Regions:
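Alpha-helix boundary/N-cap detector
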Residues: 2-6, 10, 63-66, 70-73
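Intrinsically disordered, low-complexity regulatory segments enriched in Ser/Thr/Pro
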Residues: 38-70, 109-153
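Amphipathic protein-protein interaction modules
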Residues: 69-121
Length: 153
């Protein structure tokens, strides 16, 4: 079993302990997909990559990229902080989506912007901002995350 899958399985185990039945996992064709009911958070393990996302924005982590620990940190940052998603619309067409993590210090980190090339550029731009509350208190899972980061999975 590759390291990406071991990390996915360990995160799944921790989330099921903390969030119970809200954690939904689907396995299909050597891939696993996890989402949390009522949330935009998701992650998957396929093609030897751990993919962590919130809404449409996502990041790929892998042993090959030497960034698996960053994947663990990103996962728990998304779960333990407020998330801000800003959609930019022209008419009824969304042409850009930005996702940010808002940390307790009020600092924000842009974790991704997705833009679409075809949109009615002549129409007025509307900006819609949505706030998603943290799913887990950091203090409730911090010890387990530190252990996971320091493990030899």
């Amino acid at each position: 079993v590759n390291k990406n899958l071991k990390i996915f399985d360990e995160i799944e185990r921790l989330l099921k302990i903390k969030l119970g039945n809200k954690v939904e996992v689907v396995e299909e064709n050597d891939s696993k997909y996890l989402q949390i009911e009522g949330s935009e958070f998701w992650m998957s393990n396929d093609f030897n990559e751990l993919v962590v996302g919130f809404g449409i924005n996502h990041t790929h982590f892998s042993e090959d990229y030497d960034n698996l620990n960053l994947g663990i940190i990103r996962t728990f940052d998304l779960l333990t902080n407020e998330i801000i998603i800003t959609e930019y619309k022209k008419g009824e067409t969304i042409f850009k989506v930005t996702t940010e993590i808002k940390f307790p210090s009020a600092k924000t980190e842009n974790i991704g912007t997705v833009s679409f090339l075809v949109f009615p550029f002549w129409k007025k731009t509307k900006r819609i901002t949505s706030h998603y509350q943290k799913l887990i208190e950091k203090s409730d899972i911090e010890t387990e995350v530190i252990i996971l980061l320091n493990s030899d999975l």
